[in-house]
Amino acid sequence: MGIKPSYIKNLGEELIVKHRDRFSGDFEENKHAVAEVAVIDSKTVRNRVAGYISRKINTRKR
């Protein structure tokens, strides 16, 4: 999908630090968790942040 914008990375990293136990490697679960812990009006931005978090967690597991 290409390089993520810095605001997606910054928000994703911040959410991982603050709410590490709420996120997993599953995108669908992360979508709901991001919606609960952050106020993001745009569905597109929410999904991109959830995808970034999922990818970060999955690469850390390897």
From Swiss-Prot:
GO terms for cellular component: ribonucleoprotein complex; ribosome. GO terms for molecular function: structural constituent of ribosome. Keywords: Ribonucleoprotein, Ribosomal protein. One of its GO terms (biological process) is translation. Belongs to the eukaryotic ribosomal protein eS17 family. This is Small ribosomal subunit protein eS17. It comes from Methanoculleus marisnigri (strain ATCC 35101 / DSM 1498 / JR1).
